[in-house]
């Protein structure tokens, strides 16, 4: 066989090659038909495919074997070798070993089969015939001697083997008979009976070399393997022979009966799994996937599918090369953080949901931005008709009107005048920086050199602000330069801050500018991106007129139907830094900018047309910077606006640089604009966000809406360009994309963004947590923080959703939350070991803790030797690498010093007899724990040790080096072991005073010493065994000492006594040789007097003293307590008595935190460390066991152990700050129309009597163009309304329940869309304002304004008097929407067990209906028609489970169409449960009640209240106390079968005194005839801005004149709605809200906050300002007393008080409906100054953001945050509110609140 050695050499060279062989060389030998090549290659290929398959599926060999337990691993012909290797292996290692044997067998089989073959004769030795009938193959073979049937694939597919020339003749004959004949790529006589003798010879060879050639026996088979000869299972055979024998005989000499094998398999599958009829074949090999005919299985009615492994692996697992750091350009820039707001997406994660679904966010223009019907521009002139008909489209962000002004320290008033672009930039800047980890250590005062570059152009909000009078905030809020300046100012940066305007390319140009600034050293870090928020209409008109905008809706990039772009909102910012710095800092690198640049298309045919040559040049430039070849760019994110001119030009540029027939893979192209529109100046950054999302998920999304290629664009496929139409894997060896963006003025920008470099991760960090897989139970400390509890819960909820969906590692989540996110004052901590426990913990968060502003001092406490074991739990040593390092380090030093190892001893549970091992081991454990805490970042203020522990403390504080300390401990222990006397000494701890202790010693009269003075009543005695026994006897028998607690100290020797003296001389010699240093941490020695501090605080003599003299531990603790104040006493080590000893020694234990670590006798000792971390966090300490215990030494490379990952951004608590656009021309037209109407030019329609309506709600009017603006009438005279309201009496006043408003809204929505009834119904932000009763003299209206989403409205319920058209009273507001079905299964599973726990809890209290409603009657009296609670079970005043039934007395439902899905009665009974829970709790005093004031969210679905079978529900309610007067409730409603149909979250209750509530309800007049409202005293000139952006609390007062004691008629307010009560009782906790107080005549001055001193000051001020003689000693305890005294004097001295000639309007409303409380400010009005002060505080709050409750009279305006701009605005506000004028010198930052009050009061009386 001359060819044999040559073929083997080919294999050797191929396997050994360090470089790939040339293609021609490889093709030469792999094309050879020789079995010596084909069979080994087949074995290699199939084994490799097998491992690729396992890797792709992320399963193990044993898991796969279990999956194929029935079907097994079967091999056809040569495939039997790898099949046997796999089937006989228990794990991957055995597969590799057996594959090696199979490979040798394959080579040998090929060699034996080719014996005597002439390689010079070309052609195969095997041919496959597709015969026409059974037996035809036998007929043909009989005609050609020397040929044999080698394999039967199926009855008609037969393989024939024979000599080359004979086989060729046979093939020609068969084809002549019309039979298809296929040559096999194989030479050699396989499956040939002529080989029987050769086969025996081969088998003998195998026996000679069993380790190389013998596979395991059939007994080793882990799954089914069948014989190619018989088709039967080999596993069931009795043979003990090697599988190699079976393979050799089948392959060399026997016919392959494959079809029989399949028949046997089908029979067994049918018999074994009769219930499972579907099976899959995983097919490995070269492409002969037709070798598994389905006929045998179909006969058994089995359904077979085939999985081509080659295709499967290629599809799922393209080899990922990745790149190491050194393979990136030297100046590459890392993207380490990102924040975005794009239509429908508030984060990159939400953006991916839109991209992957290929969805579009286009919609018609939102009326909330501006109402086109009110816009005058374009309404006249030649284009008026066209403008009126044109439909405007856009892609909009939600809630741009709102902003978390408190979070950013901006006053509400200033926020209202800020362009929403500035506000959103602040939010996204925070998110990008927080995600990058920058904010974790950021301090504004550091003046960091960080750059800020913003791409922006439009300032459309200027159209809104220009509708109002100018303010000091308008310029700073709308000038473009402040978009970057605002960010830099907020964070206190010194780096360059620039706004860049290049039109649509601006944001990517800003990124280029940032990259260049970092690369040039101008700044080490930068924030870059862009913004575009649509708030004005004029750009729509201008761009539309210029032909830019699509008339049909969304952008359609590259599509035949492209007709222009669709405008969009968008904001995006990325945090950038040098790639090498980012990797060094352990940042989460989201993507790498490998090349970036800009240029200009100055030679374009028109200024708005892109120039292809400029784009080509730019692409080549950035490609060259990246160091990549064009073929390595596999995705291009195009500008792609969807224009007929721009798209073809851009494609041609891409084709020129990145396309070409020589590419090895397609380059996909897309454009974000197809999903979210064209965000103009933010378009480029939006495209970059898309690429970052693609890199994160490793997929390429479809181009949304793409149908057919624009005919102007030549075919893409010839140049390997492709537009994806479905979601696909990004299967490139290195993922890199080009992002392109060009501006309408010719400015181009592009960049290359690649994936992050490979960072080698450490995989042996925690042996118990192999590779950190979440299957382990290692606990991780969780840390979540926010500025308040609302955002804390929102952050937790968002994080839980993300974790459930994305399944990150718990370790990475915990690490990122603590190490890479900013810490806020409200914090929550918890533990989790897996995702389930993580989500469970997050879902349970109710409120956080406010960390102490000044954390306590930390003291490390080291115990003495209190036992004869060390007690290190082995799990600590195994699980905490850094702890292990320090113990190992100590052990190495001990061994180096010549002593035995300490490692067995540290774990021992039995007493350690070797004193050296005991004490060195104790030292090592204490030292390791202390060092780990210090490495964790714990700031230790002092260390103290008891007895032996002081030696460890010396090492930890670096008083002694570690080696010196261990030398001392080991040598000392050796002396103890060798030099100690015969009496070891015994120690006894007693709890007695020093006098009692000394008395005991005197009575015993033995040589007993006090070894330890541990505290005032804690001492340790030392003596001989006999003498200590006498002490114990004395205490037990002598009545003087009986009851004195005592216990033996389990120490090896009696230290601090005369027993130590034999070792002292040599110990002193040792000490003198040690080097003592000044401690790096203050060391408090346990001495009677403190050791003088100095360069060497501890002298060598201390060592002998320490051993011989007593331990004055109590004195040391007292000194520390006096010096440091409240402390955290932390044990160094575990399971020692040190912390209880410290606690007993402190004078005031309640001031301290005692943190002892108990690991013994608990189920999970390793939980002690993360639990201790939580305690330290709760105390405000900055400490991380990630850096300490969990990390590897010496530098704690946690970045390679715990990954900094992307997590959902901070959830802001936004409130509305918005100036609505007003067209001044339109407003003027309205004024003219009103004047004409007043002059009689417009007739009036006489009121006609109306017949009672048939329905509760009827349509009244709607917008002429759409259903976006609707008005309905709510008919309060219907029987349904009156019956329900009459049944719902709050303190005997019939009031409309909240659920009635909801039913009316749903009924109205049904008129718009009948399908509302089968959808999920959602109510948000319900607020209840003016109460609504039964009053037939009032018109009740329902207004519904569309908010831009389909079937979503903002609604208002209000009423006006029928006779007088005064100001309407608002009763309720909220948002209603119809949504798709929501999956409640998670809630159902979570709450089912919780409800059962409450029902069976021993502390639960169960109330039946009668008792429940009796309790409730103090708040609400319910008639039978509203009594649905049959029983309720309450636990701890916080949880309740109630059974609710349909009330027995029914209410008419014929007047409503919404009863089935939103029944007022049923919903009210649900809400009653949470109301009863809250009002029956101990937090509600008997003279006060909790009233519902709003609901955050209600979701209902699958409700059918009209079905008689649905008459019982189970309601779970829980209450959370927000403050003393504010409680929030949540409720969940389940059907009888456990289905969740209703959720209500954030039901807000506020507490009111019953007397006050009754007086208010009596005064509101909603159940009686209305009074005439007060009109405004003056008419404003022009249009003024809203006075406040705060929450609106109305005092809709009807005024009446009442005589005072002087006969004067004074105007007083008698009607107040419920929201006024909220303002008084709960709003004081809202920094931006009103702080108005109800001051009644019977109000006590003390309750108003006036103590004896302030009352004296108050009276003196009144006397000085009003000229009244009021004695400070007079009893003026109530307002009435003060009022009477004032008027008694003023009736004779102040004639002006008899005239109401100066009325001040004090505005208490927000922007939507200014309402005035008209109060005469005169010297005779006793309450005027208080009202003026209150209003002054409100104005200061509006302009500073400071809470009213924190503003004191003596503070200046500057002290409360008023700056040079806001003082101008504040001055104008004062002048408007109080009708006074200030000179410039009168109003400045120096003024105090008291001075302002005095000024206004004096001015008012002039």
Swiss-Prot record:
Would I find Methyltransferase among this entry's keywords?
A: yes
Q: Which residues form the Ketosynthase family 3 (KS3) domain?
A: 330-755
In this protein, the active site sits at: 504, 639, 678, 947, 1288, 1468
**What the protein does?**
Non-reducing polyketide synthase; part of the gene cluster that mediates the biosynthesis of mitorubrinol and mitorubrinic acid, two virulence factors that improve T.marneffei intracellular survival in macrophages. The two polyketide synthases pks12 and pks11 are probably responsible for sequential use in the biosynthesis of mitorubrinol and mitorubrinic acid. The first part of the biosynthesis is probably catalyzed by pks12, which synthesized orsellinic acid. This tetraketide is then used as a starter unit for pks11, which possesses a SAT domain, in the second part of the biosynthesis.
Q: Which domain of life is it from?
A: Eukaryota
Carrier domain sequence ranges: 1727-1804
Q: Which residues form the PKS/mFAS DH domain?
A: 1249-1558
- Which residues does the annotated region (Product template (PT) domain) include? 1249-1558
Does this entry carry the keyword Transmembrane helix? no
GO molecular function term, any single one: fatty acid synthase activity
The protein here is known as Non-reducing polyketide synthase pks12
Which enzyme class?
transferase
Q: Which residues form the Malonyl-CoA:ACP transacylase (MAT) domain?
A: 862-1147
What segment(s) does the record annotate as region C-terminal hotdog fold?
A: 1404-1558
State which Enzyme Commission number(s) the record gives. Answer: 2.3.1.-
**Record note on domains:** Multidomain protein; including a starter unit:ACP transacylase (SAT) that selects the starter unit; a ketosynthase (KS) that catalyzes repeated decarboxylative condensation to elongate the polyketide backbone; a malonyl-CoA:ACP transacylase (MAT) that selects and transfers the extender unit malonyl-CoA; a product template (PT) domain that controls the immediate cyclization regioselectivity of the reactive polyketide backbone; and an acyl-carrier protein (ACP) that serves as the tether of the growing and completed polyketide via its phosphopantetheinyl arm.
- O-(pantetheine 4'-phosphoryl)serine modification sites are 1764
Q: Where is this region: Malonyl-CoA:ACP transacylase (MAT) domain?
A: 860-1156
Q: Which InterPro entries match?
A: Ac_transferase_dom_sf, ACP-like_sf, Acyl_transferase_dom, Acyl_Trfase/lysoPLipase, Ketoacyl_synth_AS, Ketoacyl_synth_C, Ketoacyl_synth_N, Malonyl_transacylase_ACP-bd
Positions of the region N-terminal hotdog fold? 1249-1383
Cofactor(s) listed in the protein's UniProt record: pantetheine 4'-phosphate
Record text on cofactor binding:
Binds 1 phosphopantetheine covalently.
UniProt keyword annotations, A-Z? Methyltransferase, Multifunctional enzyme, Phosphopantetheine, Phosphoprotein, Transferase, Virulence
Alphabetically, which GO biological process terms does the record hold? fatty acid biosynthetic process; methylation; secondary metabolite biosynthetic process
Q: What happens when the gene is disrupted?
A: Leads to the loss of the yellow composed of mitorubrinic acid and mitorubrinol. Increases the survival of mice challenged with T.marneffei and decreases decrease survival of T.marneffei in both J774 and THP1 macrophages.
Domain annotation Starter acyltransferase (SAT): ranges: 30-191
């Amino acid at each position: 066989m001359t060819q044999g050695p040559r073929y083997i050499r080919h294999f050797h060279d191929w396997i050994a090659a360090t470089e790939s062989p040339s293609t021609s060389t490889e093709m030469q030998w792999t094309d050879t038909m020789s079995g010596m090549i084909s069979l080994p290659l087949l074995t290699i290929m199939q084994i490799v495919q097998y491992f690729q398959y396992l890797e792709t599926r992320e399963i193990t060999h044993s898991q796969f074997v279990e999956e194929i337990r029935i079907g097994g691993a079967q091999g056809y012909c040569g495939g039997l070798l790898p099949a046997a290797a796999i089937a006989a292996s228990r794990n991957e290692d055995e597969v590799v070993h057996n594959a090696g044997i199979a490979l040798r067998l394959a080579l040998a089989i090929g060699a034996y089969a080719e014996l005597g073959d002439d390689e010079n004769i070309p052609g195969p030795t095997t041919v496959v015939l597709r015969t026409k009938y059974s037996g035809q193959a036998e007929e043909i073979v009989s005609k050609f001697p020397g040929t044999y049937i080698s394999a039967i694939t199926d009855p008609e597919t037969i393989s024939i083997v024979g000599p080359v020339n004979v086989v060729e003749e046979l093939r020609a004959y068969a084809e002549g008979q019309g039979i298809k004949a296929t040559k096999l790529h194989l030479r050699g006589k396989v499956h040939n009976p002529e080989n029987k003798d050769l086969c025996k010879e081969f088998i003998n060879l195998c026996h000679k070399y069993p380790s190389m050639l013998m596979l395991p026996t059939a007994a080793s088979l882990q799954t089914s393997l069948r014989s190619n000869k018989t088709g039967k299972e080999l596993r069931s055979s009795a043979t003990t022979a090697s599988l190699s024998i079976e393979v050799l005989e089948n392959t060399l000499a026997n016919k392959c009966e494959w079809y029989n094998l399949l028949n046997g398999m089908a029979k067994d599958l049918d018999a074994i799994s009769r219930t499972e009829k579907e099976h899959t074949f995983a097919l490995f090999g070269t492409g002969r996937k037709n070798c598994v005919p389905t006929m045998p299985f179909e006969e058994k009615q089995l359904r077979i599918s085939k999985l081509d492994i080659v295709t499967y692996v290629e599809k799922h697992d393209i080899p990922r090369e990745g790149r190491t750091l050194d393979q990136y350009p030297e100046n590459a820039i890392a993207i380490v953080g990102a924040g975005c707001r794009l239509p429908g997406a508030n984060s990159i994660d939400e953006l991916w949901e839109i991209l992957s679904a290929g969805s579009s966010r286009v919609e018609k223009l939102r009326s909330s931005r501006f109402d086109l019907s009110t816009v005058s521009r374009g309404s006249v002139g030649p284009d008026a008709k066209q403008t009126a008909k044109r439909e405007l489209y856009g892609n909009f962000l939600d809630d741009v009107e709102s902003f978390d002004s408190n979070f950013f320290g901006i006053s509400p008033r200033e926020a209202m005048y800020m362009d929403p672009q500035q506000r959103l930039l602040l939010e996204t800047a925070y998110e990008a920086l927080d995600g990058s980890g920058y904010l974790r250590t950021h301090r504004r005062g550091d003046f960091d050199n960080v750059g800020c570059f913003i791409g922006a152009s439009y300032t459309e909000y200027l159209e809104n602000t220009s509708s109002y009078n100018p303010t000091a905030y308008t310029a700073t809020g709308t000038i473009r330069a402040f978009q970057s300046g605002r960010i830099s100012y907020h964070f206190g940066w010194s780096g360059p801050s620039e706004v860049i305007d290049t039109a649509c390319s601006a944001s990517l140009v800003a990124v280029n500018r940032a990259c260049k600034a970092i690369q040039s050293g101008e700044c080490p870090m930068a924030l870059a991106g862009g913004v575009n928020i649509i708030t004005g209409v004029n750009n729509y008109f201008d761009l539309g007129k210029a032909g830019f905008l699509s008339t049909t809706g969304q952008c359609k990039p590259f599509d035949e139907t492209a007709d222009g772009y669709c405008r969009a909102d968008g904001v995006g910012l990325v945090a950038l830094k040098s790639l090498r710095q980012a990797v060094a800092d352990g940042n989460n690198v989201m993507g790498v900018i490998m090349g970036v640049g800009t240029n200009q298309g100055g030679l374009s045919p028109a200024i708005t047309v892109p120039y292809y040559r400029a784009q080509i040049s730019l692409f080549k430039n950035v490609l060259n910077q990246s160091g990549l070849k064009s073929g390595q760019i596999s995705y291009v994110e195009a500008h792609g606006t969807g224009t007929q001119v721009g798209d073809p030009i851009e494609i041609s540029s891409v084709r020129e640089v990145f396309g070409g027939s020589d590419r090895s893979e397609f380059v996909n192209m897309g454009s974000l604009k197809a999903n979210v529109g064209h965000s103009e100046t933010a378009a480029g950054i939006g495209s970059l966000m898309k690429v970052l999302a693609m890199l994160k998920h490793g997929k390429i999304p479809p181009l949304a809406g793409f149908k057919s290629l624009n005919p102007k664009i030549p075919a893409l496929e010839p140049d390997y360009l492709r537009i994806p139409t479905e979601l696909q894997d990004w299967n490139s060896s290195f993922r890199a994309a080009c992002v392109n963006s060009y501006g309408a003025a010719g400015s181009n920008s592009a960049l290359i963004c690649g994936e992050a470099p490979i960072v080698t991760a450490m995989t042996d960090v925690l042996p118990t947590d192999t590779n950190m897989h979440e299957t382990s139970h290692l606990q991780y400390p969780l840390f979540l923080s926010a500025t308040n509890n609302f955002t804390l819960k929102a952050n937790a909820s968002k994080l839980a959703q993300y974790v459930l969906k994305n399944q990150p590692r718990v370790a990475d989540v915990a690490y990122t939350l603590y190490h890479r996110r900013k810490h806020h004052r409200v914090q929550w901590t918890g533990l989790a070991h897996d995702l389930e426990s993580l989500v469970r913990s997050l879902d349970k968060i109710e409120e956080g803790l406010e960390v102490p502003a000044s954390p306590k001092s930390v003291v490390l406490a080291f115990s003495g030797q209190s036992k004869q074991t060390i007690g290190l739990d082995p799990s600590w040593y195994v699980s905490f690498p850094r702890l292990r390092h320090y113990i190992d380090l100590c052990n190495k030093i001990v061994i180096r010093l010549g002593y035995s190892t300490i490692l067995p001893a540290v774990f021992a549970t039995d007493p350690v007899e070797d004193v050296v091992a005991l004490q060195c081991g104790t030292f090592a454990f204490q030292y390791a724990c202390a060092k780990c805490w210090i490495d964790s970042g714990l700031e230790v203020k002092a260390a103290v040790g008891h007895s032996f522990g002081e030696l460890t403390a010396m090492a930890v504080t670096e008083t002694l080096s570690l080696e010196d300390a261990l030398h001392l401990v080991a040598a000392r222990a050796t002396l103890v072991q060798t030099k100690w006397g015969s009496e070891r000494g015994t120690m006894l701890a007693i709890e007695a005073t020093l006098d009692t202790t000394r008395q005991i010693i005197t009575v015993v009269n033995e040589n007993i010493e006090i070894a330890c003075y541990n505290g005032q009543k804690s001492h340790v005695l030392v003596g001989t065994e006999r003498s200590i026994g006498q002490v114990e006897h004395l205490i037990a028998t002598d009545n003087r000492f009986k009851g004195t607690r005592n216990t033996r100290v389990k120490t090896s020797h009696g230290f601090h006594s005369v027993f130590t003296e034999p070792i002292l001389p040599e110990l002193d010699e040792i000490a003198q040789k040690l080097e003592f240093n000044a401690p790096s941490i203050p060391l408090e020695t346990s001495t009677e007097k403190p050791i003088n501090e100095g360069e060497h605080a501890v002298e060598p003599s201390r060592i002998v003293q320490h051993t011989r003299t007593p331990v004055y531990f109590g004195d040391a603790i007292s000194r520390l307590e006096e010096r440091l104040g409240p402390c955290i006493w932390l044990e160094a080590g575990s399971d020692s008595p040190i912390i209880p000893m410290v606690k007993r020694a402190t004078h005031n234990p309640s001031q301290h935190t005692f943190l002892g670590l108990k690991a013994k006798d608990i189920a999970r000792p390793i939980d002690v460390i993360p639990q201790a971390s939580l305690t330290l966090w709760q105390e405000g300490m900055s400490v991380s066991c990630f850096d300490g215990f969990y990390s590897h030494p010496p530098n704690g490379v946690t970045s390679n152990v715990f990954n900094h990952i992307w997590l959902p951004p901070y959830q802001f608590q936004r409130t509305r700050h918005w100036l609505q656009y007003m067209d001044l021309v339109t407003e003027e037209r309205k004024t003219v129309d009103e004047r004409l109407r007043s002059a009689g030019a417009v007739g009036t329609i006489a009121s006609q009597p109306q017949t009672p309506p048939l329905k509760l709600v009827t349509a009244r009017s709607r917008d002429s163009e759409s259903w976006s603006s609707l008005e309905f009438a709510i008919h309060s005279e219907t029987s349904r309304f009156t019956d329900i309201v009459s049944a719902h009496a709050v303190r005997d006043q019939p009031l409309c329940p909240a659920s009635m408003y909801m039913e009316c809204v749903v009924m109205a929505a049904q008129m718009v869309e009948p399908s509302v009834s089968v959808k999920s119904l959602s109510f948000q932000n319900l607020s209840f304002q003016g109460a609504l009763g039964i009053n037939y003299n009032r018109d009740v209206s329902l207004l519904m304004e569309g908010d831009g989403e389909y079937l979503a409205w903002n609604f208002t319920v209000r009423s006006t008097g029928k006779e007088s058209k005064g100001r309407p009273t608002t009763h309720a507001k909220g948002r209603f929407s119809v949504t798709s079905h929501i999956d409640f299964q998670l809630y159902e599973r979570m709450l089912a067990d919780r409800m059962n726990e409450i029902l069976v809890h021993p502390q639960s209290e169960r109330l039946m209906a009668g008792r429940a409603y009796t309790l409730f009657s103090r708040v609400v009296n319910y008639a039978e028609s509203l009594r649905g609670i049959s029983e309720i079970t309450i636990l701890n005043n916080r949880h309740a489970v109630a059974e609710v039934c349909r009330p027995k007395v029914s209410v008419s439902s014929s007047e409503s169409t919404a009863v089935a899905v939103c029944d007022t009665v049923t919903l009210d009974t649900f809400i009653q449960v949470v109301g009863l829970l809250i009002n029956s709790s101990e937090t509600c005093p008997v003279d006060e009640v909790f009233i519902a004031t709003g609901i955050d969210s209600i979701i209902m679905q699958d409700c059918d209240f009209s079905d008689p079978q649905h008459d019982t529900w189970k309601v779970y309610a829980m209450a959370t106390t927000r403050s003393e007067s504010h409680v929030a409730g949540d409720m969940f409603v389940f059907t009888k079968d456990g289905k969740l149909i209703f959720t209500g979250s954030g039901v807000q209750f506020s507490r009111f005194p019953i007397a006050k509530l009754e007086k208010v309800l009596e005064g509101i007049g909603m159940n009686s005839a209305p009074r005439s409202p007060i009109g405004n005293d003056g008419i404003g000139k022009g249009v003024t801005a809203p006075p406040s952006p705060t929450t609106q609390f109305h005092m809709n007062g009807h005024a009446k004149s009442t005589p005072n004691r002087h006969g004067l008629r004074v105007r007083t307010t008698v009607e107040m709605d419920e929201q006024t009560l909220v303002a008084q009782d709960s709003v004081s906790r809202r920094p931006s809200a009103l702080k108005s107080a109800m001051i009644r005549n019977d109000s006590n001055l003390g309750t108003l906050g006036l103590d004896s001193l302030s009352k004296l000051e108050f009276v003196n001020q009144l006397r000085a300002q009003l000229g009244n003689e009021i004695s400070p000693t007079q009893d003026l305890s109530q307002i009435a007393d003060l009022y009477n005294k004032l008027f008694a004097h003023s009736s004779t001295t102040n004639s002006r008080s008899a005239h109401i000639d100066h009325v001040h309007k004090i505005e208490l409303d927000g922007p939507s409906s200014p309402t005035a409380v008209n109060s005469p400010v005169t010297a005779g009005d006793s309450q005027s100054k208080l009202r003026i002060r209150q209003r002054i505080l409100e104005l200061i709050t509006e302009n500073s953001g400071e809470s009213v409750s924190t503003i004191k009279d003596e503070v200046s305006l500057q002290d409360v945050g008023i700056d040079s701009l806001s003082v101008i605005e504040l001055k104008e506000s004062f002048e408007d509110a109080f009708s006074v004028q200030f000179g410039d010198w009168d109003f400045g930052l120096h003024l105090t609140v008291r001075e302002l009050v005095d000024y206004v009061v004096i001015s008012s009386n002039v």
